[in-house]
UniProtKB/Swiss-Prot annotation:
Entry's family note: Belongs to the protein kinase superfamily. Ser/Thr protein kinase family.
Main location: membrane
Protein name per its UniProtKB record: Putative wall-associated receptor kinase-like 13
Catalytic activity as recorded in UniProt: L-seryl-[protein] + ATP = O-phospho-L-seryl-[protein] + ADP + H(+); L-threonyl-[protein] + ATP = O-phospho-L-threonyl-[protein] + ADP + H(+)
Species whose genome carries this gene: Arabidopsis thaliana
Annotated SMART domains: S_TKc
Function per UniProt: Putative serine/threonine-protein kinase that may function as a signaling receptor of extracellular matrix component.
Length: 764
């Protein structure tokens, strides 16, 4: 155990000694090129690991030495750290860059042997392509393209035409941003990094390589590590030259018509390509020894406490990092304590602005920055006085504008209140005080506060007529606030009358109208809030809940039929719902049904229709007789309720697609056909089929069949429907009924049980 501790201690001392060795005995320069750590020349310890080892080799022609990276077999042109003035890789502020000499792809040249393609592969290395590189092609009849950049296509075409005014266009130079960024590099990219996807521009468009002898296209960005270059012969028919030397290469240098005329020159001269690099090492102790602050902490708003920052990431035991000196410091972040404070007061010209005596500022250098102090007291006082004056004048203007805006808003609310019939509503509320004392006229401010200014997060329903928001009143009550999209001004009188009528409805299975607001452009209705969704959701969506029981569905049918019977007959004046459907039947926390969205729909509808002239309703629920005559009656509500009964029995939606023929049909027609063919048991919802009271289901099906008769006169009214459902619900378990077939379809009656059991079915 002691031996292991000694080993770890010696290893730590060794890793901490690496930067010291770099300063004391290592060479920092090869020729005219600086070699900053983690790169290094010489013995182990002068560089981080083999990826960063640099050899200083002599040139075979000039005799001068040049730096060389043996691990990737490339000559080094320049190495820069982030934040330095010579950092050409400026679009990666968190990455360092290195420029290396790159080979070229060629065809038809004296030295290539028809090598028409090359591949630059930096996978599994700490190097990747920078975004300053372009694809350049030189030579006649030359079509060059990049490979391994899918799905991006990058290429251009260089031709030599008969006329200097005729220039070819790159055959696909629309460069997209590559999405092939490896996960390690993506984690190290700065969060504010925006890749550059446009092609390279030169101020003088007449000099750019635009296809006449040479062409260029922007290489994709995104930290790619594998790119290939290929050359093919162009098939352009307007050529005077087709042979000769052709070259193509990836480079960060700018080539124009003046310096890219001879393809052969690129073999001797060479080209440079820009690469980004980061730290890739298994030596986690080295990263810890830098004592840099994690850049993620700064992104979260944490105060800077170190002289350097790093983006760190560990994957598969390998440590990855990209470091930089913090703002206000300069140096090498990969050498411990090498980031030194910049004295802005001496290194920058006029860091505090104007240096005239009257406005003299004193610069004081601070760690990572500087401060400017104005010692000219009179000007300070003058500035404070002017500031107070501007503040007072600005405050007065703000208060005056606020007063005008408030007065304008008050006048607007008063106008809306009068136009929306508020005076008439107040008068009628006063005359019926005893019956509608709970109805309230809400102010727009109350409802804005209750719904958080009608915040989209409060939306609980949205449809053609308007949007419903969940709100909370100051007394703690949860309410549903219905804000219509448009109002028909010709029907405002009718709307007010409906509010009076609905305010007098007091039925436990009808959603209570609590009041309205008339101070807005369109009237807003306020209902009690029902928290458990609607029947449609529980029947047709993934709800594994209480409604899967037949007894619960039977109770819902009894409750809502009683509510509609009350609206048709027991209310002070008949109210026809006109849009009965499962989405308008709400369930509270105890699965008690409540009817919503009745009566007022014709007053606040966005389609401006009169209920006796234009068809309105929901597909699958509309009475076919009403559809043909445009005349709505109480029996039209009965038909829609019959569709809801079929939904409760079958669990199907009002419009279905037949599995055999893929034909779209209404649930009512599908149900009538199944009853004619004595297939009721087959279409019963599988969730209730095994534990339901079959005689009750048959009785309800017979009742639904009567409700769905095509002529309104032959349908029962809602009072009969409600009474029949209550009798079915309370009948003994062993009662028997017959399956009753629609006589209009001229089919034979099928029976279940004995003939004496028809009394209940006929009474329905």
């Amino acid at each position: 155990m002691r031996g292991n501790k000694n080993y770890y201690f010696l290893s730590l001392l060794y890793f901490l000694s690496l930067p010291i060795l770099h300063f004391s005995s290592c060479t920092h320069k090869c020729g005219d090129i600086q070699i900053p750590f983690p790169f290094g020349i010489g013995e182990i310890g002068c560089y981080l690991d083999e990826w960063y080892q640099v050899e200083c080799r002599p040139s075979a022609t000039s005799g001068k030495v040049f730096p060389f990276l043996p691990k990737i077999n490339m000559e080094v042109v320049n190495i820069s750290l982030p934040g330095t003035n010579d950092d050409i890789f400026y679009t990666y502020p968190s990455f360092s860059s290195i420029r290396v000499k790159s080979p070229v792809a060629s065809m038809g040249c004296s030295t290539d042997g028809n090598d028409s393609g090359l591949t630059l592969n930096f996978t599994e290395t700490p190097f990747f392509f920078g975004d300053q590189n372009n694809l350049v092609a030189v030579g006649c009849n030359n079509k060059a393209s990049l490979t391994n950049v899918e799905p991006t296509m990058v290429g251009c075409e260089s031709t030599c035409t008969t006329s200097n005014n005729s220039r070819s266009i790159p055959f696909f130079n629309k460069v997209g941003c590559s999405g092939s960024v490896d996960s390690v590099t993506r984690d190290l990219l700065p969060k504010n990094y925006i890749p550059v996807c446009s092609t390279t521009k030169i101020q003088d468009d007449t000099l750019i390589c635009n296809g006449e002898g040479c062409c260029q296209a922007k290489a994709p960005v995104g930290s790619q590590q594998l790119i290939g270059v290929t050359i093919t012969n162009s098939t352009n028919g307007n050529l005077t030259k087709g042979g000769g030397c052709k070259v193509a290469f990836l480079t960060d240098e700018v080539y124009t018509l003046s310096n890219a005329t001879d393809p052969e020159q690129f073999f001797s001269k060479g080209v440079t390509v820009s690469l980004g690099w980061f730290i890739q090492t298994k030596n986690h102790s080295f990263l810890q020894s830098l004592d840099c602050q994690n850049r993620g902490e700064l992104d979260k708003g944490k105060k800077r406490t170190r002289q350097c920052t790093c983006d760190n990431h560990i994957a598969s035991g390998m440590g990855y990092a990209s470091c930089a000196c913090a703002s206000g410091y300069k140096g090498n972040p990969y050498v411990s304590d090498d980031c030194q404070d910049i004295n802005e007061c001496t290194e920058y010209k006029n860091p505090c602005g104007d240096t005239r005596i009257l406005y003299r500022n004193t610069c004081i250098n601070t760690s990572g920055g500087h401060r400017c102090i104005d010692y000219h007291i009179p000007e300070v006082m003058l500035g404070l006085g002017a500031g107070f004056f501007v503040l007072i004048v600005g405050g007065g203007i703000w208060w005056w504008r606020k007063l005008l805006r408030k007065r304008r808003m008050t006048n607007r609310k008063r106008k809306f209140f009068k136009r929306n019939g508020g005076l008439l509503l107040q008068q009628q509320l006063n005359t019926t005080q005893g019956r509608v004392e709970k109805t309230k006229l809400f102010s727009s401010r109350e409802l804005e506060k209750a719904t958080d200014n009608f915040n989209d997060n409060r939306v609980i329903g949205q449809g053609g007529q308007g949007t419903v928001y969940k709100g909370m009143l100051v007394d703690g009550r949860s309410v549903a606030v219905k804000k219509s999209n448009v109002v028909d001004e010709d029907k405002l009188q009718e709307f007010i009358n409906e509010v009076i009528i609905l305010s007098q409805i007091n039925h436990r299975h009808v959603v209570k109208l609590l009041g309205c607001c008339l101070e807005t452009e369109v009237p807003i209705l306020v209902y009690e809030f029902i928290p458990n969704g609607n029947l449609f959701q529980h029947l047709h969506e993934e709800f594994d809940d209480y409604t899967a029981l037949w007894g619960v569905r039977m109770r819902i049918a009894v409750d809502i039929s009683g509510a509609f019977s009350y609206l048709h007959t027991a209310a002070c004046s008949p109210i026809y719902h006109r849009d009965i459907k499962s989405t308008n039947i709400l369930l509270d926390e105890k699965y008690r049904a409540k009817v919503s969205d009745f009566g007022t729909s014709r007053s606040v509808s966005i389609d401006h229709t009169h209920w006796t002239t234009v068809i309105s309703g929901t597909v699958g629920y509309v009475d076919p007789e009403y559809y043909g005559s445009s005349h709505f009656t109480e029996k039209s509500d009965v038909y829609s309720f019959g569709v809801v009964l079929v939904e409760l029995i079958t669990g199907e939606k009002p419009v279905i697609t037949l599995s055999e023929t893929q034909e779209i049909t209404g649930l009512a027609d599908y149900f009538r056909l199944a009853m004619r063919e004595n297939r009721l048991f087959e279409i019963i919802d599988a969730r209730i089929r095994n534990d339901c009271k079959l005689e009750q289901v048959i009785a309800v099906a017979n009742l639904a069949l009567r409700c769905l008769k095509k002529t309104g006169k032959t349908r029962p009214d809602m009072r009969e429907v409600s009474t029949a459902l209550e009798r079915i619900c309370s009948a003994p378990e062993d009662f028997q009924v017959q399956i009753q077939i629609d006589e209009e379809d001229e089919t034979t009656k099928l029976f279940r049980g004995y003939s004496g059991s028809t009394e209940i079915a006929r009474s329905m």
